[in-house]
Amino acid sequence: MSDAAVPPKKASPKKAAAKKASPKKAAARKTAAKKTAKKPAVRKPAAKKRAAPKKKPAAKKAPKKAVKKAPKKK
């Protein structure tokens, strides 16, 4: 509502950014609210499963490089 009260010159860039971001943010809030309201217990494991595959590749790559370098130095 604050953007609407601002003069058009100042509000135009803010409104454009808000219009672009608002639909995505609103959808994310709605989906998050639905997930938390319907099944909060199921939402946490799902988040962990999603995060695990993303973190594991990076974690695997770094240790492998370190392990390869260590024996060569020794």
UniProtKB/Swiss-Prot annotation:
Domain of life of the native organism: Eukaryota
GO biological process, alphabetically ordered: nucleosome assembly
Localization in the cell: Nucleus; Chromosome
Region (Disordered): 1-74
Protein's organism: Trypanosoma cruzi
Comp. bias intervals (Basic residues): 11-74
Cellular compartments per GO CC: nucleosome; nucleus
Protein's name in the database: Histone H1.C8/H1.M1
Entry keywords, A to Z: Chromosome, DNA-binding, Nucleus
Principal localisation: nucleus
Keyword field contains Hydrolase: no
Keyword Nucleus recorded: yes
